[in-house]
Every structure is written in C-alpha cells, then in structure tokens.
A protein has these predicted regions:
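OB-fold (S1/OB) nucleic-acid-binding surfaces
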Residues: 226-245
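Flexible glycine-rich surface loops and low-complexity tracts that mediate binding to linear polymers
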Residues: 255-278
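C-terminal motif of bacterial Sec signal peptides marking the signal peptidase cleavage site
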Residues: 13-16
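OB-fold/S1-family single-stranded nucleic acid-binding modules
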Residues: 275-304
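Structural detector for short beta-strands of small beta-barrel domains
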Residues: 211-226, 268-270
Length: 304
C-alpha cells in the first residue's frame, strides 16, 4: 500500500490557516442543494462545512483558506496550500464481486500486500441504512505477534497498510448503491475534516469547485500571464499555484528562468475556483487552483 495513507493528526491546523497570497476569490460557489443539513459537530477554528460531490461520492467536509477536502476520481483527498501534492483520505477499490470475501480477495491483489500478514474483516455498525462497514484486523499467528508489539508501543497500521492497530481508525464501506466496489476510509487519530456519517455513493455530476480534476493542456507563464488552456477547450484560465512554487520552478527549468509566456505542455491537478475580481486574474473567465504538477513537457514531478 502506498505511503500516503498515514495517520492524520489535525492538531495545530489553525496555525497553518493563513490566507494564500493573491487570492481575490469570493466564497466558493455552492454545490447543488440537498435536503441534508450541515453536521452538528462544530468545525475546527477557521474552518466551515461545505458539501463535496465528485468521484462517485457526496459528503460534508470542512475547508478553510489554507486546507480543504476534495473529491477526486479515486475517492477523496486533503489539500493544503504549499504542499506539493494531495494526501489521500478515501479510496475506491474495485472488488470484482460482492461482500467481504470479494473485498479480501481484492485487497490481496493490491500492490504491497504481504500474505504473511494474515487478516480478517470484522463487521461493525455503519450507522446508516444501505451501508456495511468492515474493519480489517490481524489474524492467526500474525495477530499474536502484533498484539505483543502493541502492548509496548503504538502501532497505527497493520495488515499491509490497510488494517487497524491500537492507534487511529480506518475501515471499508460497501454501499448497496455502488455494487462491485468498496470505499477505504482513513479516519486517523482525531476527528477528521470530513463527516464520516454523511458519506454517500452517488451518480451525481462532479462539482468542479469541490472535485480535483486532472487536466492536460497548454501552460503559459509571463510577467502578466499565468494561464492554462485545457485540451479540447477554447477557455483560457488564470492559474494560481498552491504547490509551494512547484509550478513556476518546473516552468523555469524548461525556459531557463525566463517567464516570457512560452507555451509548454502540462498535466495538472486542479479545482475551478470561479471568477476572481482583482488583478490580472479578473480578465479571465475563471481561475484554476493548482494542487499538483503531474508533469510539464513530459517531465514528471519527483515524488516527495
């Protein structure tokens, strides 16, 4: 299992919640109306609840000017300004069947699965109809070894990275409305930035304001231009870098540090932040917030 599924500690979030420079955006456009109310649980200081719809999911999540939770094609991620890439919180897993047995077989096919770390699925209460929740736990001799280790120190992750230990929580959910796949949910050790009881499988259209899209197109950076035109579109967007300088750094490497508006090919992970009303961005129809630079002119970003 990939290392981006690490336990999430949200202590000190408010320290990092400073407004990004140059963001003239108003409040993000609302998602489609639903009959559900925002969670009763109070958001963290500096955050507010909003509805997220995309990637076959809809749920309530907290967002601030610096940190937010977004849907994507694989599930959901947390993004933070000045981080090079998103941190995964939820992941769809194709099972090729139904029920917990199919889920175990699907996990055994995942990269990094170690058959020596024997595991079993334990059903728990999902707290809502049409949803089954399962927790992956160590089994057999592996369980005995883990139990001995857990008596001495915290072990947050077991079972090849998919199971629980004695610190934090993670589980799988099966939806009646989404047969043939399961959703892995990473809770961590503290109350998450999303409301786990609101997670629903859906066929609704992705909300471009709350869904991280991967777009290919043409990027230009100059003295008065930061633009991106997606393939197959005639719309030129202003781009705002949220990757801690990765976008401009990679552009500079290709142009020798000359920001002269040269067109380069790029693949970016972005959300649509709507129209801004100040600066050069105001001349564009909308603004794309860049949360990851996948590649520029065929050169892929180094994993960090």
């Amino acid at each position: 299992m990939k290392s981006y599924f690490l336990p999430i500690l949200f202590m000190g979030l408010t320290i990092a919640c400073q407004p990004p420079k140059g963001n003239g955006s108003s409040t993000p456009a609302p998602t489609e109306k639903t009959s559900e109310k925002a969670p009763q649980r109070a958001p963290y200081e500096g955050f507010e609840w909003r509805k997220v719809t995309g990637g076959g999911l809809t749920f309530w999540a907290q967002h601030s000017k610096n940190i937010t939770v977004l849907a994507d094609a694989e599930g959901a991620v947390m993004v933070r300004n000045n981080n090079a890439r998103p941190h995964r919180l939820m992941q769809w897993i194709k099972m090729g069947g139904a029920g917990p047995d199919a889920l175990l077989k699907a996990l055994a096919r995942q990269p990094g699965w170690d058959a020596r770390q024997t595991a079993r699925l334990e059903k728990t209460d999902a707290g809502r109809p049409g949803v089954e929740r399962y927790v992956l736990k160590p089994d057999g001799e592996y369980a005995k070894r883990i139990q001995d280790s857990m008596s001495h120190y915290p072990i947050p992750i077991t079972c090849s990275g998919w199971g629980v230990g004695n610190s934090g929580m993670r589980y799988f959910e099966l939806f009646d409305s989404a047969p043939g796949k399961a959703l892995f949910v990473e809770i961590g050790q503290d109350a998450p930035l999303f409301d786990e009881s609101s997670i629903t499988a859906t066929t609704a259209t992705d909300d471009k304001h709350t869904t991280l899209q991967t777009l290919q197109g043409t990027l230009r950076i100059g003295h008065e231009v930061r633009s991106f035109t997606p393939d197959g579109s005639s719309t030129e967007y202003w781009v705002a870098d949220r990757t801690g300088g990765q976008l401009e750094n990679q552009y500079d490497r290709l142009t020798g540090g000359k920001k002269n508006g040269k067109s380069v090919r790029a693949t970016l992970k972005v959300t649509d932040d709507g129209k801004w009303d100040d600066g050069f961005a105001a001349e564009y129809e909308s603004v794309l917030l860049v949360y990851e630079v996948v590649e520029i002119n065929g050169q892929r970003s180094a994993k960090q």
